Amino acid sequence: MHLDAALVSAVCGAVGGWFVPALIGRVPEPTPDPEPKPDAEPKEPYTSIAALPGLAWKSAVVSAACAGLVGAAVGLEWVLVILVPLVPLSVALAVVDWRTRLLPTRLVLPATGVAILLGLVGWAVTGDVDDLIRAAIALVVVRSVFWALWWFHSAGMGFGDVRLAALLGFALGQLGWGEVVVGVYSGFLVFALPGLLLAIARRDRGLLKSAFPFGPFMLVGALIGVLVGSAVWSSLFPAWA
């Protein structure tokens, strides 16, 4: 455990998390659907989400905790410069997706571009191109997997999830293939929990068909990948570790 990196990351995460409401409030509203579904509920405005009571301090606490865990797992490495800023962004995306079932392109694509740029800077600083190559391959592979899932079952997954998959693939790829595989797979496992737990608690199998936004669970899975991906991968496939 890297306590120095954990402390620095937690402080940075807390500061970034405090500005989550401001970030959400500046996201432009999407273009209205020309043919909305008759039973579609009105979208909650981003400004209303940004004004939720206590969102700033709650986001700061969650971001600090998650960033601290990331720092403790990774240590004072260049990849931390890529990962820590993604923590408050991930909190913002999770909040927005949970309440609107949308992952704003204005947040995901610029973040992906910045992550790639920082990866290039890391290559220039450290001279190690292996992490960058692995991250680029992971971006393409993970995005392609999610694109295929979206193409064959678009009702269960939005294209925002595909864009987010590219960002997470690149970020996890900076660490290793264990983090990529465990991070992506964990997202699907965690996604299955809410409906299952509700169905068990209420003894209603119909709740298994309840729809939940996928983005927040992808982000939780990515965090799991960062924290235990390498260890899980090494224990399952020691020859590939």
Predicted regions: what they are:
Residues M1-A241:
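A membrane-topology feature that recognizes alpha-helical transmembrane segments
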